[in-house]
Amino acid sequence: MTRWGFGADLSIPLPVSRSVYPANDEPAQTAMAGIGQQSVRTTPLMMAMVAATVANDGEQMVPYLISQTLDADLQVVSTTKPTVARTPIDSQTAATLTGLMQQAVSSGTGTSAQVAGVSVAGKTGTAQTGSDDGGPITWFIGFAGTDINNPTIAVAVVLDGGEQIPTTGTGGSVAGPIAASVIDAAVDQ
C-alpha cells in the first residue's frame, strides 16, 4: 500500500493526517481490510487521490489547493505545475478499474451516484462500527466528467456513522447521493 502513498506525509497548506495501512498484516487481516473490517486508517483526501489515480491512467498527482495566484489587476502571478507523485498502477490496470467502477455506478451498488449527461465511475463502501449508537461508516469514491476518458473531478464522500445514519445505511444509499450532488455541481461549472 505504500506505493499508493499510505504512510507518506502530504505536503499541502492544511493539517492532514497520514493514511496508514498496517505493516506485516497476515493474509486474513488483509482480506478483512478489503471489506472495511480491520485497521486501515485513511482520509477522504487520500481516497480522492486513489480515485484520481485511476482516472489519471495510474499516475498519482501531488495534491494542491491553488492552481493560480492573481494580482490586483487579475494578472497571473504564479501557476501551480501539476506534478506526478508516484505511479502505483499501470495504465492497463487503471483502464480495467475504470470499467469496473463505471459498472458499479451504472448497474451496481453506486447507481445513486448517477448524474444525467455525466459519465461517473465509482465505488461504494460500508463498514460496521461495532456500536449500537448509530449506523455504519459509509463511503463513495469516484471520478466523473462529460467524457470518462477526460474526467474533471475526483470525489470522496464519507459519513462516519452516528445517529443520523440508519443502521441499514450503505455507501450507495447514503454517500452516493451526496457524491452525485457534488459531481453535478462541479461538472455543471
Where are these regions (language model features)?
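Beta-lactam-recognizing serine transpeptidase/beta-lactamase-like catalytic domain environment
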Residues: 1-161
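Short, gly/Ser/Thr-rich active-site loops of penicillin-recognizing serine hydrolases
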Residues: 76-83, 173-189
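Generic non-transmembrane alpha-helical segments
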Residues: 100, 165, 181-185
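A short acidic/glycine-rich loop-to-helix N-cap element
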Residues: 159-174
